[in-house]
Amino acid sequence: MTGIDTTKRARLEIAGWSVGDAAEFLGLTPEEAAFVELKLALASYLREVRGARGWTQVEVAGLLGSSQSRVAKMEAADPTVSVDLLVRSLLRLGATREDVGRVIARVA
């Protein structure tokens, strides 16, 4: 588990608290946790690309032939959004394969 110092963790455990991360709480396997992190990273990068180009969600939706609400779901890594859709959308918006590869590599 990361994100909490050992002293604070020990104090919480002594007080009767169980300390863990979201993956532990949800009972995710390491593979499932990695997939969730990958999807979140791609969604975040989509938001970053849109912001860097000064586009609104409506403008991105027009470029992708989609709706603003779908773009919002993509940026939020909604469960209805596939990794495939995120990657194809990033490429359509001008990201390179290398850009997408760097995002994926950061998760590993």
Regions found by a protein language model. Give the residues of each.
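N-terminal flexible/basic segments that precede or flank functional cores
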Residues: 1-41, 100-108
